[in-house]
Amino acid sequence: MASRDFLGRFGGEKGAASDKAGGGAGEADEVAELSLGLSLGGCFGANSGRDAKKPRLVRSSSLAAMCSLPGTSDDLAAATPPPAPLMRTSSLPTETEEERWRRREMQSLKRLQAKRKRLERRTSMNSGKSGGSSSRDDAQEPLYPSAFQLRRSVVDQGNPSSSMPEQGSGDGAEVKSTSSMEISSDNNNNASNQNKSLPPPAPSPAAGKLPNGIVKEQPPLRTLRSLTMRTTSTGDLRKSMMEDMPMVSSKVDGPNGKKIDGFLYKYRKGEEVRIVCVCHGNFLTPAEFVKHAGGGDVTNPLRHIVVNPSPSVFL
């Protein structure tokens, strides 16, 4: 009895232990694996055993294709939501075509306004300059008559019959006089317009004054008397030069002899006589001058040199 109880108790404990072990294994199977280790496919608790139909935890992933769970496609579609669309970021805000065109139109309008202001400023400056010059011309017009007006007045004074009609000529003379008067008035108008357009003439040289009020002396005019005096002075100078440095020429006989002109250079007492050759401009002694003319070595070279009292062409 005791042995039975012992065996039964012992066997019961064994059965109870086996029951407890079975219950613990079931509970261990029911507990999900929540370890921090990496798993293939990004899924936790994926057992291919008898508990494959139990709900499992799904790890989030950036790509939906990475998660592969055993089961039907409907369960996967219900378990994994569709990924949100990715938005591309940019540093500058995107602008539409209308804003771009509006900005370009504003820039073109600003450029046109600036250009218009520059043109208005330039025209105002030009008008001010033209107004000042016209007033200056009007002020100087009665002081300086034009050359055309002077010529017209001289012609009218020389031909009085052209401006006055002949007496007793009848209607033809009157028509001629009226037409001549109209032509003269038109010419006067044209002359006044030309006078306005021409710059004012320069003041006369005799009345030249400096800014300090000092009258500047002008050079004398070249008159006929001054020219004659100048010619006489040059003639006197040439005459004095001929007296100081007379013209000479060589007189050499022989086949190699030739005539060479020169002039006796001015010298003082005690200095050597020197002759300037006209053909080369060299300063030569009398012996060298005769040798230059082809005379060779002579004992008295001054006998072969002739003094010309008349002026030479070279002076």
From Swiss-Prot:
Keywords: Nucleus. It is found in: Nucleus. Residues 184-197, 221-234 have a biased composition (Low complexity). Residues 99-108 have a biased composition (Basic and acidic residues). Its main location: nucleus. Residues 156-166 have a biased composition (Polar residues). Residues 1-28, 68-142, 156-237 are annotated as: Disordered. Belongs to the Ninja family. This is Ninja-family protein 1.
